Amino acid sequence: MKWKIIADSGCDLREIENLAPDTQYINVPLTVQVGDKHYTDDASLDIDDMMIEMYQSKDQTASACPSPDAFLEAYKGAENVIAITITGGLSGSQNSAQLAKNMLLEEAPETNIEVFDSLSASGEMVLFVQKANELIAQGLSFEEVVAALKDYLASTKLLFALARVDNLVKNGRLNKLVGAVIGMLNIRLVGNASPEGTLNLLHKAKGQKKAVQAVWSEMKKNGYKGGRVVISHCSNPEICGLIQAAVHSEFPDADVSSIHTSGVCSYYAEQGGILMGYEA
């Protein structure tokens, strides 16, 4: 195998369409813990079942990163490895991936490997993985692919809109009263990924349509000019259609796609939420 593209399941993409020649894509799963149950975030995960259990449980919930060994097994067997993880601000996945890189280079020092911290998650990671595949398909060298991906990652952004905040309340990150008010008043929390890779609240919007307006306003404020958009949603295709309509109202040829959030991204976005990546 000449190339491997590795992402943890902070990337919602389970497989790549039109995979570049002599290339393999592997999605390394995180796990979500609800009480005494552990859900492995792979293609067999029943996300709806996990979400039901999560909302019914009064116990704290947590996500856990893949082990270095899990990344190492994914890395092995290719001349060139491109890897990306969910932001180090939310998970230890980046640390595991870097440890695995060091382990790989001890075993196979001739391997070319680059491990990226997305400083983001979900839709923005999908954009990165798709771009990596396109660059490899062009026949570029490892160094050229890495340089292009560094530039690309600096040009993409993440926006989120949350309809529920049960996990934030349950895990002590948000006041119970604030969480209850958000639910009762149909408030949507709209924000972005900060340059440091943490989630940053920008707006409190009343209802889904106002949330879409806030998302679209932020996109334009950040220099959106009709680039690719990937909307990762947790069981909310309606908001995807509204965002697509907003984008196409000014950029009718823009490539806007949607995908259901992975298990760990469903855990963070919660029911009705989105984690959207776009090219600024």
Task: State where each predicted segment sits.
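Flexible, charged surface loops at secondary-structure boundaries
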Residues: 1, 75-78, 222-225
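N-terminal glycine-rich anion-binding loop in soluble enzyme alpha/beta folds
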Residues: 2-64, 70
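Generic beta-sheet signal
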Residues: 3, 81-83, 227-229
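Short beta-strand segments
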Residues: 6-7, 85-87, 117
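Mixed-charge interfacial surface used for oligomerization/domain docking
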Residues: 10-31, 90-93, 97-102, 114, ...
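Alpha-helix initiation and N-capping motif
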Residues: 47-48, 68, 129, 142
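Active-site cofactor/cluster-binding pocket
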Residues: 66-101, 105-106
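A short helix->loop->beta-strand "cap" motif at the edges of active sites that frequently abuts
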Residues: 110-111
